[in-house]
Amino acid sequence: MNKIYRIIWNSALNAWVVVSELTRNHTKRASATVKTAVLATLLFATVQASANNEEQEEDLYLDPVQRTVAVLIVNSDKEGTGEKEKVEENSDWAVYFNEKGVLTAREITLKAGDNLKIKQNGTNFTYSLKKDLTDLTSVGTEKLSFSANGNKVNITSDTKGLNFAKETAGTNGDTTVHLNGIGSTLTDTLLNTGATTNVTNDNVTDDEKKRAASVKDVLNAGWNIKGVKPGTTASDNVDFVRTYDTVEFLSADTKTTTVNVESKDNGKKTEVKIGAKTSVIKEKDGKLVTGKDKGENGSSTDEGEGLVTAKEVIDAVNKAGWRMKTTTANGQTGQADKFETVTSGTNVTFASGKGTTATVSKDDQGNITVMYDVNVGDALNVNQLQNSGWNLDSKAVAGSSGKVISGNVSPSKGKMDETVNINAGNNIEITRNGKNIDIATSMTPQFSSVSLGAGADAPTLSVDGDALNVGSKKDNKPVRITNVAPGVKEGDVTNVAQLKGVAQNLNNRIDNVDGNARAGIAQAIATAGLVQAYLPGKSMMAIGGGTYRGEAGYAIGYSSISDGGNWIIKGTASGNSRGHFGASASVGYQW
């Protein structure tokens, strides 16, 4: 609200005075330089002359009225917060009659100072602020407003800080505003200049930490991922995860490794579990198989492509071998289709028969030759020759896992000129070179199952189609693979130690972020709880503490109020149990 200068008679001073009533919100006022108060003095002289006329009606000429020189007094507004310019010399004024009896006075000049403009309407002079203000050192106001026409924004202040609000509320009474043009402080990782693998905040100064964050700062915030890259053995920076980026945990080989991610504590904690997928090797019809049989019932999901332990492999190899049986050729009792499996490590004895001598030899290449010769030292007649031969029998070697398949299990006699067939069963190779028959295990054996070790719980490897199954010999129980070396290349088996290391690293990073956040909250609680001085002219040192979910924060603060109660300063320093520190400082003016 704009006021004007008014000229009134001050009976206490016995003089005319000029009183300024400019708007009290202006902290610096323009001065009014008054050289001569014409109007007020003329009015006084007229009134005085009228009074004299009543007493001396016959007088045509009035004597000069001698008055004390009027002194110009410039007052502050009623709040007492205005500023008074120094009054120039010779600013007093007077009204008098000249020698011709004419009232004479100096002129009054009202000037508008800095940032003010003046408008005259008759005898009224109205002061107002200019549209554009310059060279202001401070402005004290309860509310500062910008713009108009529905876009007006008000800025106010309270104990919590500055408040921004639209003059006209939007949908659902929303008065919030957007602050645009805020500069970004953090490293810009949004530029299309290649992948960012690592970001540190070493370049952020303490002063920059007190800045307001922009949306770009929020999008540039994140955390670093470090680990062993494919084809390397040393830990290195892998990637920088920004806000809203997606971190996906996947298995490099779903046939051997499982990855499960679970959110807990209402999203405050995420567990990543990495496990090994195992298979079981089983024996079926003399062959090693793994995985679930096509006709097998039950809940087994073993596809035969999982991991197996060394013991399971050994047990499976011990079940490997070649199968043999006797035939009905030359009148001998055969074993039909029932084969005996000669497993790895089984001793096979070729014994001399009646009238024959068995010779077993091994060449430099490791080939074993079994040769039967007639014992010519015995005198034989024709009948003996015709009935001579050798008995063929099949027995399991004592102490071995070999067995004789049921069927033609009784000894069979091979007579002269009768053919004895030695057939190559599964995984057996027979090479006949003249009279020599070489029997060897195939270098590429195929087994339906391989048991490693003895007993019902011995690990067994078995094949089901294209699947490898690993389990106990009897009930196909899950078994462990031990003494597995750490994987180095892609496709290598990962051991439990590596899996625990990955999980522990992830948990440590997540726990570290959570701990820092909780410590920061405790630090903020301690700072917010600091008390401050509230009486003019008083100062206060305060210390406070705070805790939040196992973390602690502490703060110390200093506050002071000026003697007039207008100025308030406050500073705080704080820290937390994570070894991080912060500080704040503020100054305020209240009226």
UniProtKB/Swiss-Prot annotation:
The keyword Protein transport applies. Keywords: Cell adhesion, Cell outer membrane, Membrane, Protein transport, Signal, Transmembrane, Transmembrane beta strand, Transport, Virulence. Residues 1-51 form the signal peptide. It is found in: Cell surface; Cell outer membrane. Residues 504-591 are annotated as: Translocator domain. InterPro entries: Coiled_stalk_dom, ESPR, NhhA_Tpr-ring_dom, Pilin-like, TAA-Trp-ring, Trimeric_adhesin, YadA_C. Belongs to the autotransporter-2 (AT-2) (TC 1.B.40) family. Homotrimer. This is Autotransporter adhesin NhhA. It comes from Neisseria meningitidis serogroup B (strain ATCC BAA-335 / MC58). The gene is nhhA.
